Amino acid sequence: ERGWFDILDDWLKRDRFVFVGWSGILLFPCAYLALGGWLTGTTFVTSWYTHGLASSYLEGCNFLTVAVSTPANSMGHSLLLLWGPEAQGDFTRWCQLGGLWTFIALHGAFGLIGFMLRQFEIARLVGVRPYNAIAFSAPIAVFVSVFLIYPLGQSSWFFAPSFGVAAIFRFLLFFQGFHNWTLNPFHMMGVAGVLGGALLCAIHGATVENTLFQDGEGASTFRAFNPTQAEETYSMVTANRFWSQIFGIAFSNKRWLHFFMLFVPVTGLWMSAIGVVGLALNLRSYDFISQEIRAAEDPEFETFYTKNLLLNEGIRAWMAPQDQPHENFVFPEEVLPRGNAL
């Protein structure tokens, strides 16, 4: 006798245009609510009460300048539930306090996890290995570290990125000014992973296109391919000879080549996520104190490192009063950074 679980299992895994599955119970509601919350916030909701900013289409922003802003610093790490003590069930007040940000961040995180579980589930049903899901763990790690773990290490959700294009750019400048993020080795590994992955992708695609078998008469080489054909569609031997002539070494194993293409960007993103967890704890890296001391003592000595530190000071001094108006920062002229050349 089949129970309700088996009946539900059959329905969830039924062959349909968009597969649902058990993962869909988490994925579809969370993705719908996160995207819907973002579209609602960017269309109607102001950031006047949290950041002193206009951030919606209703206020005159465009696609690049709208955002769903983080809650005010005074909210701390409250989940800002609609029925919580801050909003007390008042939807308008909840939006004004920044409740949409926590709503989107949490539903977005669970939506991404649901998408990874979807890849696990379908891989199991189709009978393939789960490397797609493993690879997707990298962007999830970056999202969770940047949007959740970093602000949890700071004083409030206020210091997380707001959900918007220009808002993310502001956050990048904040990370540079307050953490010297570009000199952090974990960021360097992240850049190497992303750019290295792009390079590998371009090289691989070009090499395959270069070595396609001439097995059709059409103007387009794409027409000669059949997804059910048994034979190879390009010559690995020719590709190997081509790169052997250029570099002296080349991949001779397709499985190792494709694992390497998986490994480079995924490892880079994971390293970057680990670095952001370090920033959540205000860890520092690569402070070249000897250069700083010499630059302070010798007016003629300056390096790109010491110049960048001055730029960071400038970001902090000019950004903090704008970015954190609730602190009422006032920096007198004499504390603003001056380079040795000045």
Curated annotation (Swiss-Prot):
Protein's cellular compartments: Cellular thylakoid membrane
Residues at which a plastoquinone binds: H204, F251
Cellular component terms (Gene Ontology): photosystem II; plasma membrane-derived thylakoid membrane
Primary location class: membrane
Binding site for chlorophyll a ChlzD2: H107
Residues that hold chlorophyll a PD2 according to the record: H187
Top EC category: oxidoreductase
Cofactor mode of binding and number, as noted: The D1/D2 heterodimer binds P680, chlorophylls that are the primary electron donor of PSII, and subsequent electron acceptors. It shares a non-heme iron and each subunit binds pheophytin, quinone, additional chlorophylls, carotenoids and lipids. There is also a Cl(-1) ion associated with D1 and D2, which is required for oxygen evolution. The PSII complex binds additional chlorophylls, carotenoids and specific lipids.
Record has Iron as a keyword: yes
Transmembrane spans: 30-50, 114-130, 142-155, 197-217, 268-284
Catalytic activity: 2 a plastoquinone + 4 hnu + 2 H2O = 2 a plastoquinol + O2
Claim: Transmembrane helix is one of the keywords in the record: yes
Cytoplasmic compartment spans: 1-29, 131-141, 218-267
Membrane topology value: Multi-pass membrane protein
SUPFAM superfamilies assigned: Bacterial photosystem II reaction centre, L and M subunits
Similarity comment text for this entry: Belongs to the reaction center PufL/M/PsbA/D family.
Miscellaneous comment as given in the Swiss-Prot or TrEMBL entry: 2 of the reaction center chlorophylls (ChlD1 and ChlD2) are entirely coordinated by water.
Subunit note: PSII is composed of 1 copy each of membrane proteins PsbA, PsbB, PsbC, PsbD, PsbE, PsbF, PsbH, PsbI, PsbJ, PsbK, PsbL, PsbM, PsbT, PsbX, PsbY, PsbZ, Psb30/Ycf12, peripheral proteins PsbO, CyanoQ (PsbQ), PsbU, PsbV and a large number of cofactors. It forms dimeric complexes.
PANTHER family: PHOTOSYSTEM II D2 PROTEIN, PHOTOSYSTEM II PROTEIN D1
Name of the protein this chain belongs to: Photosystem II D2 protein
Lineage, uppermost ranks: Bacteria, Bacillati, Cyanobacteriota, Cyanophyceae, Thermostichales
